[in-house]
């Protein structure tokens, strides 16, 4: 944390160009091993005029423009660079306070990954700049130092200049910087992942995590919705949330700002502030390269076919596409130019079509090597995409990869990924989608012979039926638009042609768009309730209400024991919990087919369900009966390796799309620092399990505790199996490095009970959290009255830990001060201590904290109810009620000395039995606002998590 005495660097608005160029050069050097041979001045890429104008607007008004209109290839990803520099200016007092977080939201998973990767690369460059202590600090280092001043962490780890986040799958993967709430941050998200969190119902999140994630993504945040015309409902929803936040109490920080970025605006609101590219005004020297892109050579070639029907896997489309690819390859090979990459792009409408095209190219030996054609679709497992990116890093840049001759893709490549194809083959799609696909060709305008072939029906009359995911009217309009473009003297699909003859907007998939109102938000904010049924967010998030748009995921594991109880035990252990990295994205239709699958003996293989952070065994219905369970968006099924076929070319597909030869899959390895040993899966049982033979699980647990070292922890199953010689042996055990263990519990309930060092006294912990809360509030610029309320709440947030049952669980000395956390315990020891304690299952210490403070009104000030709320919700529970009443919470004889049991019981009955707590929650939400209260709770939780992370 930057202390008040630390001098901040000097940064001026005029240095944005140098920052932009320096960051671009640093990224280029990090991604390319070969040195840049161009003259130094030619190497520098300065911002375009429109990018400078956006920064000027932010610096002048303290808010982002509502809309950015910029054609494909004009550098919309620079919103990240602008965000970082604007915050650096704000940090040194050279610009007004602006949102600390930027969330780039885009509707393709691969694009979200691309945005996240770029953010991580920028972070790497800035961290490297901080280590350069030679001479006068350059602009990168000064910006990094300015951004670093927003951090409040104080441990052995150096603070980052900014944080990154990434939510693109069906699992909550702890990839949001909720603990560093004051930091500048860049977050990449899909529309569903962002939108569900904006409405307090984060897909894949635990109930306790929901309010914290909502606060992070909707307060002190600018959400940039890329290609907003593809997500009109989400745009309406987030804009309405931003409006309603203006009715809430003013905390002194920016509320949600929403920016739509697109080449085809989705609204015609004349009151919106719009900035962007004017293709008629590109005379500035800095716009020379942009002019090359806008007027690049992209010849349009229409290829009509008789048997076009818009269906997946259409053989005529596949054959015509393969034929066009062959001609492009022959042309490129004849033209030489082997020193440059000339990758041919192919973008089609369906995964089945993409798979068929790749299979045809490989089968017909169109290319010398199968590896020369790569498949890229949105339903790839992140682990597989990582491997592809690591193997072909330059493929995902405008430089290109010479070893890849063809990329076959679906809509994944329509938006945002910085590929640069020499030529493109695509099939008829809505005009706005085609415009995006055309943008993947000759992006920099360097080529003079690039062509775009569009496979289309022989006649517009052939487009009569919908061809999901597209409507007939949109395809028909696109056909007419292409004919108009083709009628020009030199048919082109470059950005200038798109401006002169704009693509026809797709027809709305809904008659009316829904906007959330105040009562909706109050209801959604009841995040800890157990409703009969979760609200269907499609109404507020999706342009289409088709149920099949809902997504889930599939995971395969090769190390689960056949004993289902032992397998559940592994999956419920935090180290081995499902992760987004190993999840195959799949729609609910695919998941349902997996559930219905029977092997050759008519047996349904076992499946595990991961939903909202909880693991359960899927209960298949008996023959002739309906299952009592049903799938929901965000559900993830876990399968044993090979038990159910569901992939083709490594992509989750329907059963009718399966290949004739079964796909070979591999399970994703566990992170570094974790090693799992399962008896029945172990290749060398004599070596790995010999010392545990004949021991009960309890005896093994004690032995493993003694074997744990300062750098490694060992945990074991509480279940046993029968060894080959008939002796008892544990089902599994694991070795975990302490660094991995510390990371796995950060922010969890377990972190509230242990540190991996010395015990922590309760008074010390609460004072530290209160002080960190004060620092956070000051850093954020919170209004003083709310800073005081937060500090009071933090000072007493763990009072409930004084309960003697909790102290016994921590192993506290009755003659010494109360503990906040035990010391020198592994996670496994903490779990065992809790299970053996006198505390009932589900008991919440923060519920008792709120009660004890409510019984001592002298401890709280003006905002009494707000303080109580922040205390009671300090771990995400109690919104709007707690699961347990006064009798469950209190037990006579276990209260700390000085507390009157009867008086406290009476107060607890009033709060948790009669309903005063529910009323308190309702009133504070109405008085302060659901987003404001969630944000204040999140600040206190961040302070608590930071102090715990630092071992206090």
Language model features with spans:
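Inter-Walker segment of RecA-like/P-loop motor cores
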Residues: 127-207
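Interdomain hinge/linker at the junction between the two RecA-like core domains of SF2 helicases
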Residues: 251-257, 261-333
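Conserved strand-helix element at the start of the C-terminal RecA-like helicase core
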Residues: 101-115, 119, 332-363, 374-375
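C-terminal helicase lobe and adjacent C-terminal extensions/tails of nucleic-acid helicase motors
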Residues: 330-341, 356, 363-397, 429-430, ...
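Divalent metal-dependent catalytic cores for phosphoryl transfer on phosphate-bearing substrates
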Residues: 477, 753-759, 778-952
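Conserved Walker A/P-loop ATP-binding site and its immediately adjacent core
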Residues: 97-124, 128-142, 192-196, 231, ...
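SF2 helicase catalytic motif II
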Residues: 192-250
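Conserved pre-motif I regulatory segment
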Residues: 3-69, 82
